[in-house]
Amino acid sequence: MNVLLMAYGTPYAPEEVEPYYTDIRRGRRPSEELLKELAERYEAIGKSPLNEITLAQAVRLQALLNLEAPPYPKRLLGPFPPRAPHGPARVYVGTKHWHPSIGEAVAAMHEDGVRRAVAIVAAPHYSLRSVAEYREKVDSALKTLPEPIDFVWVESYEAHPGLIAAYARRLEEVIWRLKNPGKAAYVFTAHSIPLSAVEKGDPYPRQVEKTAELIAKKLALPRFHVAYQSAGRTPEPWLGPDINELLRTLKEEGYEEVAVQAVGFPADHLEVFYDLDLEAQATARELGLRLLRARSLNADLDYIQVLKDLVEAAWPR
C-alpha cells in the first residue's frame, strides 16, 4: 500500500519566505511591503510547525497502516505479531509550495517502483482552490514520468465520524472552560476562498457548513456560526463573514465569550497562530470578548486513525 500525503508546506527560515511566497503567487515576487509584512508575521509566531506536523502525520499513518493487530484470540497463548493486510505501507510527503514538493514526492515514488497509490490532502474539505490544485500538481508531475502511477484520490472527508468526534472532543475541552455558557457563541472557521469559485459551484462552503453542523449536533450546541479567515490580498471579493467582522457582530448581540474551532485547518500553522491566536484574539480583547480556541488535531492518533480509515477504504482491492 502506497500513500501520497499532501499539505501546504511552510518556510523553515526567514530567508525562505520570499521564494515560498513567490511560489504561492505562481512565480510573481511579492512586493517589498508585502514581503516585510509576511516576514513580520512569521517572526510574531516564532515559527510555523506545519512541516514537522505533516512529517509526524506521515510517520504515524505509516505505522498504523503497518501495525494492524490480528483478531484477539480466545486464549492468549503467546505473542501475536502485527500484520499488514495489504503488504508493507509506505507514506510519502509532498507539499504544495515548499520541499519536498509534490513533484519531488511523485518522482521518489516512481523511483521506488510505486505504480499505484492513494492520494490524500491533510485537509477535510474539497475546493477548486485547494484539493483541485493539489491534483493539478500531481498530474503535472505524472507527465514527467516514463511510466504512470495510478492514483486513487480521497478528495474530501468533511463528515467522517472519526473526524467529527475528534473535533468535538477538542471543542468540549473549551466548553468546560467557559465562565458563562449561556452568553457564549460557538464559531467554526475555515480558510476563505474567492467568491468566484463559489459562483462556479465550488462545494467548499457546503462542506464546511456540514462539518460545523455535525460537530454542533454531537455536542448539542444551542447555536453556532461559521466564519472565514485568511482571505487573500487580491481585489476580488472573498467568502465571508470574516472572523473579525463576526466577532464585532457577536459583541453587538450581547455575547461575552466565543469558543472558536478552526475546522478547516487540522494542523497548526501561520494562519492559526497569527490570524486566530494573535489577530482575532486582539479583536476580541478590544471588544471585551473572551475568546478561547480549541486545540488542533495535528498528528494526534485520533486524526491519524481517520486518515488510515480513508486510505484503506480507497485502496484498490
From Swiss-Prot:
The entry's keywords: Cytoplasm, Heme biosynthesis, Iron, Lyase, Metal-binding, Porphyrin biosynthesis
Positions of disulphide bridges: none
Annotated metabolic or biological route of this protein: Porphyrin-containing compound metabolism; protoheme biosynthesis; protoheme from protoporphyrin-IX: step 1/1
Location in or out of the cell: Cytoplasm
Single biological process term from Gene Ontology: heme biosynthetic process
InterPro entries documented for this protein: Ferrochelatase, Ferrochelatase_C, Ferrochelatase_N
One Gene Ontology term of the molecular function aspect: metal ion binding
Catalytic class of the enzyme: lyase
GO CC term, one of those recorded: cytoplasm
Signal sequence extent: none
Function field: Catalyzes the ferrous insertion into protoporphyrin IX.
Entry protein name: Ferrochelatase
Organism: Thermus thermophilus (strain ATCC BAA-163 / DSM 7039 / HB27)
